[in-house]
Amino acid sequence: MAPQHLPSTRMAPQGMLLGLLLASCLTFCLSCQNSNNFALTNPEKSTHEDSDTKETRREEELDAEVLEVLNPTQEWQALQPGQAVPAGSHVRMNLQTGVNEVKLQQEDKFQSNWKGFKRGRRLDINTNTYTSQDLKSALAKFKEGTEMENSKDELARQATVKQLFRPIEELKKEFDELNVVLETDMQIMVRLINKFNSSSSSLEEKVAALFDLEYYVHQMDNAQDLLSFGGLQVVINGLNSTEPLVKEYAAFVLGAAFSSNPKVQVEAIEGGALQKLLVILATEQPLPAKKKVLFALCSLLRHFPYAQQQFLKLGGLQVLRSLVQEKSAKVLAVRVVTLLYDLVTEKMFAEEEAELTQESSPEKLQQYRQVQLLPGLREQGWCEITAQLLALPEHDAREKVLQTLGALLATCRDRYRQDLELSRTLGSLQAEYQALASLELQEGEDDGYFRELLASIDSLVKELR
């Protein structure tokens, strides 16, 4: 009879074998499931490449979409993927949760940046910000534009000027066709002198030539050119004419030529102009002629100490005294007084300047010291003459006389104190100008003309006490 059951010693090995088989199957299945985590070769590179590709695609998708702007507050807020924040916000990563968070950094500084932001709008990048290169480029373009505009304006201006004027060559050509010659100032003066000196010229033509010549000799160079070709001596000789008009306009030309022109002044003294001028003033002549001659004399004497010496030697002070005392020439009295004042102050300033600069006897200073003007004025009775002229009715004349009295005060003090008429005149003028100065003050003029005259009178009265 066959046995019904296997012995226990044989069943044990079979059970163990079956268990090992099941364990091997289970291990194989698990290894297949986790092969990526437990493989001997690490596919990290390919994994990163896949993730980078996904991130790039995600960023492109976010760029294509309208970014949602998160409005930060003073509290930390979670920042979701795809959300944008304004510039200046404070962003951090929460290490506990791994989430990006955002909040305001300084509310008072950045609040104005996001007040205008609204959800659903694209992030507004500040387009008003420029780099230094942008600014340099813009400035260069601006300068180029300005230069272009300036050049256009300049061209337009030149075109306008060209329309108003014509080329000199074109004018010369037309003048040649019309037999008209363009003359220089020198040529014009030569022509005028020839016309004046011609015996065939009428009186009117001679006077017209002198009148035109006076216009040109105002310029220093033209006056010296007049001297260079002998025209000055021709005009000086015109002072000997028997025609008062010729004397008048010859003196008119000489006065313009002498003015502030030392070279011409020297030649005039050597040419006998001073003697001729004094003769006209000392003789009976029309008043207009004497006015022009006195003008020429003043131009010759000013800033020319040698001429002043010759003036005193030739009896110039006596000639002027006689001129002032003429009843018909009272209008010239103020001009004579003004000339004397200028000569006195000119010498005074020259000596003071020499002392301040400590110059050792220059030639011009020596010439001024040889001019004995103040003693001559005292001897010739000018202390009394100037005091009498203070009675003139014109305010301007009184001003000039007061200036001269002040300049002569050191020389004529004793004479002024003895002059009772001068004291009465000063008292009368003092009362008159006090009233006029009061009217000026009422009108709001603190430094008016009459106050200045009153101050001069008060100062003179004080000096004579």
UniProtKB/Swiss-Prot annotation:
Job of this protein: Required for protein translocation and folding in the endoplasmic reticulum (ER). Functions as a nucleotide exchange factor for the ER lumenal chaperone HSPA5.
GO cellular component, one term: endoplasmic reticulum
Region feature (Interaction with HSPA5 and localization to the endoplasmic reticulum): 1-260
Keyword annotations: Endoplasmic reticulum, Glycoprotein, Protein transport, Signal, Translocation, Transport, Ubl conjugation
Entry similarity comment: Belongs to the SIL1 family.
PTM statement from Swiss-Prot or TrEMBL: N-glycosylated.
Subcellular location(s) of the protein: Endoplasmic reticulum lumen
Leader sequence residues: 1-31
SUPFAM superfamilies with a match to the protein in the record: ARM repeat
Glycosylation sites: 197, 240
Superkingdom, natural source: Eukaryota
Region called Disordered, residue ranges: 39-60
Descriptive protein name: Nucleotide exchange factor SIL1
Gene Ontology biological process terms in this record: protein transport
Subunit-structure text: Interacts with HSPA5.
Protein encoded by which gene: Sil1
GO MF, one example: identical protein binding
Biased composition (Basic and acidic residues): 45-60
